[in-house]
Structures are given as structure tokens and as C-alpha cells.
Amino acid sequence: MNAEKSVREPLPRGFWVIWSTVALDMVGFGIVAPILGRYADRFGANGFQVGLLFASFSLAQMVFSPILGRWSDRVGRKPVIVISLIGTAIGSFITGAAGALWVLFAGRLIDGASGASVSVAQSAIADLGAPKQRAKMLGMLGMAFGVGFVVGPALGGLAALGGPHVPFYVAGVLASINAVAAIIRLPETKTAREHQPVETHEHKHRNISSWVVIGFFSTLPFAGFEATFSLFGGSRFNLTEAGTAAVFLAVGILMSAVQGGLIGPLTHKFGSLPLLRIGQVFVAVGMLFLGAAVVWPVLFLALAFMVIGAGIASPSLTTLVANSAPEAKRGEVLGFQQSSNALARVIGPPLAGLAFDHIGVGAPFTLGAGIYLVAIVVASRRSLHSAV
């Protein structure tokens, strides 16, 4: 009865403003990501340079996320989110106006360095909500990612009808509007809750390190999946670009449904740590099935396992990080987690590509399942006394 009541508790004031800020930010990202490779090709970029272009965003994000997270702990969440959105707008405009490949890299580096808005938004959500609400709220924040990845590519495709550079200008305009809206409507959450005594014992810091390691080994194979699934689908199932886009659309919708509708009730029933382990097992099993899939039913089953597992595990892990972090350093800790995930997104795609080229079509996913087992082992063996 108490669990049911807690699930139905109203969300704190300001939540939907933060949610809409992240959703609009992800729409802009969704506009750019699918077309960036073809856009770079116009500047004579080869495949390796396109890979570096994608990696440059994650590298900049890896470096600056902890810095901006620490800054948000000192000056507040709102100014850092606003500055990040302004940086995203500048990076998008530079990318759209690029006349040479190096300018394109500059735009992506600026955009990546400004990519701390997500981890700072997660910190703002954690500031607003009581620990028992965080999993639900962070899951719903994850739903904003799904909305962005569904709406963004469609909007980018329409914008591209006006020219290859237009989608980047559209993304820049959206980020500018988002920044203005954040200045007007976004609440400052850093002072919304009274500072409470927090554990600062060494074991708690070890717990945070464990969560970051788990996040890295969870993100690494999933980033490889995102990078090589189109190659796998084309080789084994004759999927066209439109077919691959439809698959990712379905993935985004299912992920949004899981994170927006299921994670709250499931967390209140089972707890974040058990859900993390369940989600990890689902993803590992899904990747094994995907690597072996040669018929459509197995493909759909594998993708369902992966998406449901990731939809459960990701917000559960973020909740555990947020609950383990001292309140005064929550932004820095969540920024460090995002930095670790960004590093995995730098390493994962080229590793998966090498496995595809030199081992076999399904190798990225079979090996990915093995890598994911490392995350499962760490989650199972570490003594995580602060888990809730």
C-alpha cells in the first residue's frame, strides 16, 4: 500500500521544465547525429575521419562533463545548463557554416564540450526528488532521450530538403530557444533542498567508483551496437537505410515506454540494485541472441531483450550514483559518470567495427555480451552498502 502511494506521489515542481529542456536538447542531437557522416563526406572526409568526427564530440564531453558538473555544485545547476545550451547552439551554427573539415571538427568539439547539460539536469532532478522518487524521475528523464531520438531524425530529414547545412542551423535555433526558455522558466534546484548530513566514508567513494566502472562496461558494447547494427542488418537481413531507421524508431519508442512507465513501479517493488542486475542480464542475453540471429523473430526478440534491459538498467544505475554521491558533490559525480560513458562511446564503435571486419558479422554483439558480463560481475561482487 505504501509502495503504491509512493508511486503515485506528485512530481516536484520544476520537474517538467527540466524534462522539456532535456527533450528539446535531445531533439537537436537527434537532428544532427544521423546526417553528420554524409555531411562530412562533402568535405572529403574518409571513413576514419568520420569516425574521428564522432569521437571528437565524446572526447570533449569526457573532458568537460566533470568540470561543468563540479561548477554546477558551486554556482548552481541553472547557469551551467544555460551556458551548455548556448555552447550547443554555437557549435551547431559553426557546423552548419563550415567551409572546411577542420571547422567541422571545431563545431563538434564545442558541441561536445557543452554536452554536460544532461548530467547537470540529472543532478537537478536528484536535487528536487526524495531518494524514493529518483528512479521514477530519472526514468522519465530517460524518456526525454527517446522523444529526442524519435522526433529529431524526422525533423532533420525534413530540414535537409532545404540543403545539407540546414539541419545544423535548425539544431542551433532550437538550442537558442531552449537557452532562452531555460533562463525564463528553469528553476534553480541546488538550493531547493536543505543540506543534509551525508556519508563521506571511504566505502561510499568505492561504491561510486564501482558504479562508474559498471557504467563504462555497460556503455561500451551498447555503443558498438549503435555503430554497427546498420552494417549487421544490411549484411544479414538486407535492411535498407529506411529499414534501419525504422528499427531505431521502434527502439526509441520501446525505450521511452519502459523508462517513462515501468521504472517507477518496478523500483518501488524491487529496488534499484536488483533492477540493475536484472536489466544487465536482459541486455547480455539480448546481445547473444542478436549475434546469432538469422531469422526475423530472433532478431525482434533479441532487440526487445536489449531495449527492455537497457531501459531498466540505465536509470537504476544513475539512481544508485545519485544516491551514493554526497549532496555537495552530486553534479561532479554525475558528470564523472557521464565522462566515463563518453570514453566508452569513443572506444566502443571502433572496437565493434574491427570485430565486424575481422571476426564476423555477429561478432560485435557476441563479444559485447562478454564485455557486458564484466559489468554484471562487478555489480554482483562489489559490496555496495549504500544501494537503495
What residue spans do the PLM features occupy?
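Helix-loop-helix hairpin linking two adjacent transmembrane segments in secondary transporters
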Residues: 141-183
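Short amphipathic helix-loop junctions that connect adjacent transmembrane helices
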Residues: 34-47, 228-243
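Conserved MFS/SLC helix-loop-helix module at the cytosolic interface between two early adjacent transmembrane helices
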Residues: 62-99
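Juxtamembrane intracellular "pre-TM" segments in multi-pass secondary transporters
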Residues: 2-12, 187-217
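Cytoplasmic helix-loop-helix junction between adjacent transmembrane helices
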Residues: 107-146
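Helix-breaking motifs and short loop linkers at transmembrane-helix boundaries and internal kinks
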Residues: 44, 76, 97-102, 292-294
